[in-house]
């Protein structure tokens, strides 16, 4: 499969970039902190036009689990907040990440409007 096309489809189906403004603060960013466009999000996930991007989605993750999941539904928004535990392949080092997702309904599906995640 073409990983670039898969990543584009993932972003289009999970993030609201095509219908409204999105705020995106990925987990492992230091130089360009926010990725508030589809092209910048794509660069974060598969590498591209931002030097620090090495492709979060291309890294071989063995396991990703969620702890302390909190969910809030108000008006037309749904919000999820918790901790992700990321375990790479061939490593015992687990990275804990605090995350917040704000979802909005677009064309009868939920999509991410705000994504913030930071290592703990």
Summary of predicted features, one role per range:
Residues 1-46:
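Core segments of small alpha/beta cavity-forming domains
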Residues 8, 22, 43, 54, ...:
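Short non-domain terminal segments
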Residues 14, 54, 115-116:
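Histidine (H) residue identity feature
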Residues 18-20, 38, 60-62, 92-95, ...:
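Generic structural motif recognizing short loop/turn segments at the entrances and edges of beta-strands
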Residues 27-89:
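Surface-exposed, charged secondary-structure patches
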Residues 73-81, 85, 90-120:
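Short beta-strand edge/turn micro-motifs at domain boundaries
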